[in-house]
């Protein structure tokens, strides 16, 4: 995908007097927000199978292969998400790698921004979004289709 500097934002009135913005962070600016974004990514990765840790993402995001998004409310990063454009032989998709938010509140605010993320995907020739997620998130994404399940089996015991 290459390094590109995109600044997308959309203000959405919150229930209170504040507003929330979602920003796509350019690869060159990752270091400016990483200290705030990383703990939120770590929250999401607690539910993973150990495929990666947040620090593994830094060089990939900085190379432009993955994208870092942050939701900001009252000058505070309340949620962060990492996406990646995947080119399958017959289609191109935007995959959500991880999404995490403070106290569970940050994630709920992403739903308002899905059209913005969909627009980014369309701009880059993607025909759909893809995410590997837990059941609770599937229920919240009512216009998404549960296409299949990913199951895992740990083989570490066999290797000992």
What are these regions (language model features)?
Residues 2-52:
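Short amphipathic alpha-helix that is part of the acyltransferase structural core
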Residues 2-8, 131-160:
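Active-site/acyl-donor-binding loops of N-acyltransferases
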Residues 19, 93, 148:
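A residue-level signal for beta-strand positions that form part of recognition/binding surfaces
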Residues 47-68:
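Active-site rim helix/loop that mediates acceptor-substrate recognition in acyltransferases
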Residues 61, 73, 119-121:
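Structural motif
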Residues 65-105:
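Conserved donor-binding loop and adjoining core beta-sheet/short helix segment
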Residues 89-142:
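Acyl-donor binding region in acyl/amide transferases
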